[in-house]
Each structure stands twice: as C-alpha cells, then as structure tokens.
Amino acid sequence: MRVLLQRVSEASVTVDGTLVSSIGQGVLLLVGVRHGDDRATAEWLAHKVAHLRIFEDEAGKMNRSLLDVGGSALVVSQFTLYADVRKGRRPSFIEAAPPNEARPLVDTFAETLRALGVPVETGVFGAHMDVALVNDGPVTIWLDSAELRGGSLD
C-alpha cells in the first residue's frame, strides 16, 4: 500500500460540481493499493499516519501528531500511485489492485483512522474527483508499506 500524505490547512473533494467532503487542518491522504495488500497493512499504515509527528509544537519543531492537534483526514483512493513509467510513454497500472480488492482496503484504512479518534472524510471511490488543497508547509510525505516494513509485516 502507498499513501501520499500532505499536511493541509484545508482540503476538499468535488464530484460533478458537488462538494462531497472537506476538512480544515489535518492531512490529505492519497491511498493506493497493490496486488497482495491486506487488512493488516491498511491498519498498520493508518496507525503510522495517525501517530506521525508532522505538526509543529510551541518551539516550531515537528513534534505533534494528527491525534495531538485534533486534525482531520481526507482519504482519497488513487490507483495511479502504482503507475509504472519505466517503459514507453503511457503509464502502466498493472501493479494496482483491481477495484474489488482495493476498495475494502481503502475503507479499512479510513475506518482504522476513525477508530483511533481521527475525524475522517473520504472521496468517492472510482469517481473522477476534483481535489483541492492548501498544502501547509509544504509537508508532503511518501509512505510505502513495502519500504517501511522491509516488505514484511514486521
């Protein structure tokens, strides 16, 4: 699983001209699922995101987590995080899990964040979305479960 985390002062998703979700201070989380990902990976990444110290404390150091600041999360599925551009000019998405595998894991990721106490909004799975954000910092962090866990669940 891959998550592109962006610390935001606000973010929103619009589908067909209708605002479907928005948050204030928190994180925009673009989530990609690959073949072989599982529920444990989704839960592990949600815990990682909720506890990452990416917000400044009184001294200006990144020392506070999403939970510490009472921030929200906007979770948006994005299979294109698994684009392979090594050959040719058109990206291949063969590594991305099909929708019937990806959707439950994106849902598990969002539900785990909620269970941890993070207010969560979501995009619309599979829809063409207009995603707006004000990146705070900017702080943008790439989380890849295969890299973070050495390819295993350890």
From Swiss-Prot:
GO MF: D-tyrosyl-tRNA(Tyr) deacylase activity; Gly-tRNA(Ala) deacylase activity; Ser(Gly)-tRNA(Ala) hydrolase activity; tRNA binding
Keyword vocabulary terms for this entry: Cytoplasm, Hydrolase, RNA-binding, tRNA-binding
Pfam families assigned: Tyr_Deacylase
The keyword tRNA-binding appears for this protein: yes
Signal peptide coordinates: none
Subcellular localization: Cytoplasm
SUPFAM superfamilies the UniProt entry points to: DTD-like (SSF69500)
EC class: hydrolase
E.C. number(s) listed in UniProt: 3.1.1.96
Major place of residence: cytoplasm
Gene Ontology CC terms: cytoplasm
Catalysis: reaction(s): glycyl-tRNA(Ala) + H2O = tRNA(Ala) + glycine + H(+); a D-aminoacyl-tRNA + H2O = a tRNA + a D-alpha-amino acid + H(+)
Placement of sequence motif Gly-cisPro motif, important for rejection of L-amino acids: 137-138
One of the GO BP terms on file: D-amino acid catabolic process
The protein's assembly and partners: Homodimer.
Physiological role: An aminoacyl-tRNA editing enzyme that deacylates mischarged D-aminoacyl-tRNAs. Also deacylates mischarged glycyl-tRNA(Ala), protecting cells against glycine mischarging by AlaRS. Acts via tRNA-based rather than protein-based catalysis; rejects L-amino acids rather than detecting D-amino acids in the active site. By recycling D-aminoacyl-tRNA to D-amino acids and free tRNA molecules, this enzyme counteracts the toxicity associated with the formation of D-aminoacyl-tRNA entities in vivo and helps enforce protein L-homochirality.
Record remark: domains: A Gly-cisPro motif from one monomer fits into the active site of the other monomer to allow specific chiral rejection of L-amino acids.
NCBIfam families: D-aminoacyl-tRNA deacylase
UniProt similarity note: Belongs to the DTD family.
Protein name: D-aminoacyl-tRNA deacylase
UniProt organism field: Thermomicrobium roseum (strain ATCC 27502 / DSM 5159 / P-2)
Gene name linked to the record: dtd
